[in-house]
Amino acid sequence: MKTLLRAATALCVLLATESRAQEAVRVPAAGKPDMAANASFRSFIDALRPDAEARGVSAATFDAAFRGVSSPDPGILARTTAQGEFGRPVWEYLVGAVSTGRIAKGRSQAARLSGTLSAIEARTGVPRWIVLAFWAVESDFGASGGTVPTIRALATLAQARFRGALFRNELLDALTILQRGDIAPEAMKGSWAGAMGQTQFLPSTFLKHAVDFDGDGHRDIWRSEADALASIAGYLQTLGWNRDLSWGYAVTLPGGFDLTRYRADLSDFTKRGVRRIDGEALPASGAASLFLPGGSGGPVFLITDNFEVIRAYNTSDSYALAVGHLADRLAGGPALAAPWPTGAARLDKAGLQALQKGLAARDLYTGDADGRAGPKLREAVRRYQIKEGLVADGYATPALLEHLTARP
């Protein structure tokens, strides 16, 4: 399970990080066709045919897939900037992801699809509220699965060698899906990066984890709600979802709480006075760690291994927190009470990179200096805070960077 979780997370990182395209698609000037670029694109498609045939894709399927696809999409690579959940502070992301309207819509969907969700829950052990939250965040309950033709999008990215061979392989997987008859070429649509349908699965994820839950002979994550919901749940189950634990718990800490002991069993946190904000008791056991995404003055969470399962779907902390908190709200849980540090200064990308480099120089950080907050940086910040006798909340701030740079 851990190997699969690491592999899924690695694939998400490739899609969620900033563009390092090795070769940019040429954009035609003043709307005129770029004949050289188009010819190169067609040559790329022709060169793909033998590999597609080796995977069992027929000439008829190949030709149908690329019918009308004669040029790269000039807008695709322009969109390979960081995804919104990385660029915005978590509290801004949550405003849209866990809105009052979305909560109401989700509860309505839960009532309408109660029978289907019960069957999926029984089969996979993944709570309906988690499945609905993913469905909401990924495609607004199926309403926004994407309108970009997948074959052209993947061909554009593959021909430009964006992310090396990743999108070439995804393109071949998309052709395999068409060969198997799950969807017609003209209906295979999704995001600019090839994430498809209501689940926003990449083709490789679709081939491994998509489910024909409604029994019509097609794994249809574009038009079948049952297939989409069951595919989300089945994927989470395969990634290692623990049916006995939540993703995490919004909690309050007692005064004088020792943040240096941030990883422990849930029973230990209970003994130390940690309480859920909904008034329910924490489970009797289970590994958990404190997560303070806005620092020690903001909301506090105890997160479990299921939080990492959510992050395997999308590596953003903001995304994972949105899915988890939305699931809680759909189930009737309370809103977060503690205020977010909305007026406090934040580190920009350059500041985060400087912090990463400074912590790496002290052998505290082992990740890339990519300017992104995440578990590795959070852990490194905590180690530095503990070493320096600071409040060990794992939160990267300008003050922390100043403290670090003042101690060469």
Spans of model-derived segments:
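Sec-dependent signal peptide recognition
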Residues: K2-A10
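Sec/Tat signal peptide C-region and signal peptidase I cleavage site
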Residues: T17-A21
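Short, solvent-exposed loop/turn and secondary-structure capping segments
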Residues: A24, L77, S144-P149, M188-K189
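Extracytoplasmic and endomembrane cell-envelope/extracellular-matrix remodeling and assembly machinery
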Residues: G31-S70, A78-Q83, A158-G194, Q198-K357, ...
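Export/targeting segments at the very N-terminus of extracytoplasmic proteins
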Residues: R42-T61, G101-A136, T147, T156-F167
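Acidic helix-start/capping segments at beta-turn-to-alpha-helix junctions
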Residues: A60-G87, W135-S139, P149-R152, A250-G255, ...
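Signal peptide-directed extracytoplasmic domains
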Residues: G68-L113, A119
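Short acidic, glycine/serine/threonine-rich helix-capping segments at coil-helix boundaries
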Residues: L347-L352, K357-L404
